[in-house]
Amino acid sequence: MVNMKASMFLTFAGLVLLFVVCYASESEEKEFPKEMLSSIFAVDNDFKQEERDCAGYMRECKEKLCCNGYVCSSRWKWCVLPAPWRR
């Protein structure tokens, strides 16, 4: 008797494989891996970081001061959220 989890996993893996094969056959003229990776990791200009006078969360705070609501960690020199033991 086949375990239900194993059969669901195989079904899901089969569907994923079918999707990849269908997509590859439709886009033969494209460079498949490069196109797929570029669409997954596409960076929009709206999401790029702006240059600030202060450092945000998990940013280095050696030269810059941390933005409002963050404190500079004395151990790691990153801007972190304030906690009772960091005051």
Curated annotation (Swiss-Prot):
Highest taxon listed in the record's lineage: Eukaryota
One Gene Ontology cellular component annotation held by this UniProt entry: extracellular region
Principal location: secreted
GO terms of molecular function: ion channel inhibitor activity; toxin activity
Subcellular location: Secreted
Pfam families named among the record's database cross-references: Toxin_12
Tissue expression summary: Expressed by the venom gland.
Residues in the signal sequence: 1-24
Listed PROSITE patterns: HWTX_1
Cysteine-cysteine disulfides: C54-C67, C61-C72, C66-C79
Annotated keywords: Disulfide bond, Ion channel impairing toxin, Knottin, Secreted, Signal, Toxin
Proregion residues excised on maturation: 25-52
Domain writeup: The presence of a 'disulfide through disulfide knot' structurally defines this protein as a knottin.
UniProt similarity note: Belongs to the neurotoxin 10 (Hwtx-1) family. 51 (Hntx-8) subfamily. Hntx-8 sub-subfamily.
Function statement: Ion channel inhibitor.
UniProt name for this protein: U3-theraphotoxin-Hhn1m
Organism: Cyriopagopus hainanus (Chinese bird spider)
